Amino acid sequence: SLFYSLPWGWWTFTYGYSQSDYRTRNEASGFPFKLDGDSRSHQFRAERVLHRDGVSKTAMSLGLSHQRTNNYVEDTRLEDQSTRITETQLGFNHGRRIGSGFVNLDLGWQQGIGALGAQGRGHPQAGDPHARYDKYSLTLSYLQPFQLWGERFSFDSLATGQRSEDVLFSPQHISLGGNSSVRGFKDQTLTGDSGGYWRNQLRWRRAVEWAPLRP
C-alpha cells in the first residue's frame, strides 16, 4: 500500500493506493480446485478547511476512487464476481473540543459513475448489485480522557451508519464484526447495503514498569 499527503494552505491533497492478492485451494464433492484473485484500489481526495479556531475545525472534501477486483476458479475469470467500480465522494467534517472531550461529525455522499473504465450499467435483475449507485454515510464520535485513582483512562463512543436504496457490490457494503467495528466478533461478520452500529470503549493506560521493556 502507498499513501501520500500534501498540505497546501487551507487545502490538503491525499492519494492512496493499495493492492492485495490471494490464492487458495478448495474442494467440492471430492474434487479439489484452485481459487485466486487480486484487488487494486486508487483513492484521491482534496480537503478544504472552511473554518478553524482554538476549539473547532470545519472542512469539506471531494474524492475520486477506482477499484478493480478479479476472481478466478481454475484460471477462469468469474465475471459476476469481478468488478470495476469508480466512485465520487463528497464529505463534510466538523470537529470540536468540549471541555476536555472531543466531538467529531462526518457526513458523506458516495456515487458510482462510469469514468476510468468502470463497468457499465448493464441490465441487472432484481437483487443484482448496481455499478451506478448512491450511498449516504454518517459517523458521530466522542472521546473523553479522564483520571481516576491516579490512573489514566479514556472513554470513546462511536455511532456510524450508511444507507443506500441500491443493491451494492460487497466493497461498498457496511460490515459489522472484526477489530474495526464490534469487538468480540473476529471470525463472524454481517454485511449489508444499509445499516449501522454503536460502539463504546473504555481504555486504561498505564506506564510500563518492567525494566526490560522501558525505553
Per-region residue spans from a language model:
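C-terminal outer-membrane beta-barrel translocator/porin domains of Gram-negative envelope proteins
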Residues: 72-215
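Gram-negative/organellar outer-membrane beta-barrel architecture
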Residues: 1-99
